[in-house]
Amino acid sequence: MASAEQKHATGNGTTGNGTAMNDVDQPKDAKDLLPHLESLERIIKLPVVNAAWDKSQDVYGKVKGKNRVFEWALTAAEDCVTRAVTTAAPFVTKLDRPIAYVDQTLVKGIDKLEVKAPIIKDTPQEIYNQAKSKVIDVVQPHLERVVKFKAAGQQKAASLKDLAWQKANEVLATQYGSLAVNGVDTTTALAERLLEYYFPKCESDVEEDNDDKQNAVVQNGKSSENDMPVPASEDPVLHTVQTVGRLSNKISRRVYRNVSRQIKQVQKGNINDYLSSLIAALKLHQYINFINSSMGTNVEQSGGSSSDACSPFGTTTSTTTTTTTSSTSNNKPVVALPHVAKSKRAPAVSSQ
């Protein structure tokens, strides 16, 4: 009996010990070890805080799963925090009353904040929409005022333009205005004739003009007949403007095409000939300048020795002086003989 009772007691003890061990070995979450904080729960339930919390968790999960090194480091940090909470839980439970008092105080503060600032209950999108509507309500009146001023200015400008256009048509409708319009037409026709003479149109110009007309029809929906100006009887001002503009465009296109065509036709040989002739002209100019400078130097030197008499036979100053002295002493006329070199003496002539 004793053994049976001992076995039964041992079995009961084992069962009790096993139950106690199971209670100790059951892992508890770190959240369950800490006291419940109503203030923290209400703060997390706020839309703005909740959105920020979800976003931070999303970023944390992406960073943690991006690399094994990050995953290992963050997992180790989580384990350290869990162990710290588990270690500090027995000490925190002893401070339940102060923590509860602080929690209730924070809850009351949150209630007052929700009453004074109800915007904290709204979602971020609702806050954005409200802020946008406030800004629009403030700015919209000023924008409407600016738009009104702009519309009034455009209307005044249009009315002034129409009035000026009408007055110009009235002036051109008179006799002198008609003469001026006819003069513009005559001058335009003469300019077109001169343009055709000096800058004739080639086949490429015709093709480009046709392409331009087709592009204008595609873009503006206008036919090629609208290329001609309106009659002067309908609108003299518009007729004059279109005539002058058409002539200006025609001259610019024709001159540009002819000049570009001439540039394309210039060959490398022509360029070489032009450069060689230019170099020869420069050399000739330098040679002429050199001759002129040399002649100027000779003239200056001859001007410095102008006291000596010159003759085709050489200088005769000393000979003349000697002859004059001898003739004075002998009282006989003596003729000055030219100086002759010894190697070129004249042969003696007999007196017979």
UniProtKB/Swiss-Prot annotation:
Gene Ontology biological process terms in this record: lipid droplet formation; lipid droplet organization; lipid droplet transport along microtubule; lipid storage; lipid transport; negative regulation of lipid catabolic process; positive regulation of triglyceride storage; regulation of transport
Cross-referenced Pfam families: Perilipin
GO CC annotation: cytosol; lipid droplet
Predominant location: cytoplasm
Compositionally biased residues, Polar residues: 298-309
Stretches for region Disordered: 1-28, 298-352
Role this protein plays: Essential for embryogenesis. Required for normal deposition of neutral lipids in the oocyte.
Protein name: Lipid storage droplets surface-binding protein 2
Source organism of the structure: Drosophila melanogaster
